[in-house]
């Protein structure tokens, strides 16, 4: 009886322990699922929001690889077997290229690796990654054409392209109040109130959400205005009035966009991130709210760039600013060398493209710079954005080397040389001279501390010897 009782007690204790262990595993699994996108170690816990997720995995979140493959196969079979091929070579070439791109996009959306973002759906960001690959291949193709063939190839996309742009008058009368115009003295100001004003505001609002730092946004905004001043002898549309540069652009449009962006960042960093499955919410109002929040981030990471903390972070931040400015300049130079008017839909599509890939690229760059333990290589979208920016610049260099090599005015060159020298001087002082000086002082203080400790030990030994001698005499 005693042995059987002992066995029962042991079996009951084992079952209870197994139950507790399974419960703990379940809690850990839910916790890991909820923190799938936000957990990056203890070092980033202060900048990362806490996420609670009930782990619901519905039809919306599944891969659907077989479904996409079936639809794609049926579509290709329909075109092959039931549709008669037209005898138009140009039309067939366009349709074949578009079909090839669509097949690649279907493969990428279902099979490519997920990025750091999961809202509104991971497939959305995989789609834009594949679009960036297609765009880079298109740029490489344009790069390997002659200047004439490349410009005429744009007619293949839109017959209205491939024509030299008409010359326009920029700058002109810069008086805010024109007393010579009796009917409307403020006509110069009203002329600037066009569609580019909300475009500037919206652009910098989105850039602030990408960069998530007020200082970096302001530096990029101000530096681009300096670049416009410096390069207005190359591109006429850079020639603007002083108040258009500093009041309309920097203060009003860019500044207000950055301000609204920072307020949105504050809200995103403070809001709770609690996710429930749609069918687990009892009320219709809660369901509608959940659908709306599907278009907000799954979790939030506050970017702390800290450029002065180390040489690596300083060079990374300088590189980010440089690539940002180069991408901004490419917008204007590509329009100029490929003969695309500013209002063309391809220009707008390029901006929409960078809006969607820029945020992912910035997050991947920040993770690579800030968290090498979990991110040992640069992210795929950041790699593609860097390659696209460089390729666009190479197209500009090849298609119009004369314009881009026009020498800067002497006073502009002096200003840029002075600025570069100041930045290099500060870099050498901050990360070399200052660090060496601080290290030397620290070593010197350590040596002094050791000498003082050795002296105190020696004095203690001498005093102890004297005490022992006194005791011996007594």
From Swiss-Prot:
The entry's cellular-component GO terms read:
endoplasmic reticulum membrane
Keyword Transmembrane in record: yes
Cytoplasmic topological domain ranges are 84-96, 148-313, 357-376, 425-474
Pathway membership, UniProt: Phospholipid metabolism; phosphatidylserine biosynthesis
> Where located?
Endoplasmic reticulum membrane
Membrane topology listed for this record: Multi-pass membrane protein
Q: Which InterPro entries match?
A: PSS
Q: Where are the transmembrane segments?
A: 63-83, 97-117, 127-147, 314-334, 336-356, 377-397, 404-424
What the protein does comes down to: Catalyzes a base-exchange reaction in which the polar head group of phosphatidylethanolamine (PE) or phosphatidylcholine (PC) is replaced by L-serine. Catalyzes the conversion of phosphatatidylethanolamine and does not act on phosphatidylcholine. Can utilize both phosphatidylethanolamine (PE) plasmalogen and diacyl PE as substrate and the latter is six times better utilized, indicating the importance of an ester linkage at the sn-1 position.
Name the PANTHER family on file: PHOSPHATIDYLINOSITOL SYNTHASE, PHOSPHATIDYLSERINE SYNTHASE 2
Tell me what this protein is called: Phosphatidylserine synthase 2
Name the species this protein comes from: Xenopus tropicalis
């Amino acid at each position: 009886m005693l042995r059987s009782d002992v066995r029962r007690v042991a079996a009951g204790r084992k079952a209870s322990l197994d139950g507790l262990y399974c419960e703990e595993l379940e809690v850990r699994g839910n916790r890991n699922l909820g923190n799938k996108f936000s957990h990056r170690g203890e070092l980033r816990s202060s900048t990362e929001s806490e996420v609670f997720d009930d782990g619901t995995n519905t039809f919306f979140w599944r891969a659907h690889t077989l479904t996409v493959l079936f639809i794609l196969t049926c579509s290709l079979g329909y075109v092959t077997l039931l549709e008669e091929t037209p005898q138009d070579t140009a039309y067939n070439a366009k349709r074949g290229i578009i079909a090839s791109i669509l097949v690649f996009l279907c493969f990428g959306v279902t099979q490519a690796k997920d990025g750091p973002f999961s809202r509104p759906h991971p497939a959305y960001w995989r789609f834009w990654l594949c679009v960036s690959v297609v765009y880079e291949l298109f740029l490489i193709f344009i790069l390997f054409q002659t200047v004439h063939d490349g410009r005429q190839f744009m007619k293949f996309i839109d017959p209205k392209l491939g024509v030299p742009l008409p010359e326009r008058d920029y700058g002109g009368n810069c008086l805010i109040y024109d007393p010579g115009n009796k009917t409307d003295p403020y006509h110069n100001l009203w002329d600037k109130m066009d569609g580019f004003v909300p475009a500037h505001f919206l652009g910098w609002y989105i850039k602030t959400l990408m960069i998530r730092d007020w200082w970096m946004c302001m530096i990029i905004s101000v530096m681009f205005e300096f670049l416009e001043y410096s390069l207005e002898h190359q591109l006429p549309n850079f020639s603007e009035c002083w108040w258009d540069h500093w009041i309309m652009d920097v203060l009003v449009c860019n500044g207000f966009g950055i301000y609204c962006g920072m307020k949105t960042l504050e809200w995103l960093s403070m809001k709770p991130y609690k996710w429930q499955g749609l069918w687990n919410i009892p009320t219709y109002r809660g369901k509608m709210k959940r659908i709306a929040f599907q278009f907000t981030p799954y979790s939030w990471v506050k970017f702390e760039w800290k450029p002065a903390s180390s040489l690596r972070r300083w060079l990374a931040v300088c590189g980010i600013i440089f690539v940002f400015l180069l991408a901004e300049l490419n917008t204007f130079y590509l329009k100029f060398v490929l003969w695309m008017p500013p209002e063309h839909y391809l220009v707008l599509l390029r901006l929409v493209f960078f809006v969607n890939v820029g945020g992912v690229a910035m997050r991947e760059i920040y993770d690579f710079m800030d968290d090498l333990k979990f991110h040992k290589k640069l992210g795929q979208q950041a790699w593609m954005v860097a390659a696209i920016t460089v390729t666009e610049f190479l197209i500009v260099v090849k298609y119009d080397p004369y314009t881009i090599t026009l020498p800067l005015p002497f006073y502009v060159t002096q200003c840029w040389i002075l600025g570069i020298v100041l930045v290099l001087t500060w870099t050498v002082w901050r990360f070399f001279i200052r660090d060496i000086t601080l290290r030397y002082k620290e070593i010197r203080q350590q040596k002094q501390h050791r000498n003082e400790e050795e002296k105190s030990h020696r004095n203690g030994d001498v005093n102890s010897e004297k005490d022992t001698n006194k005791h011996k005499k007594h």
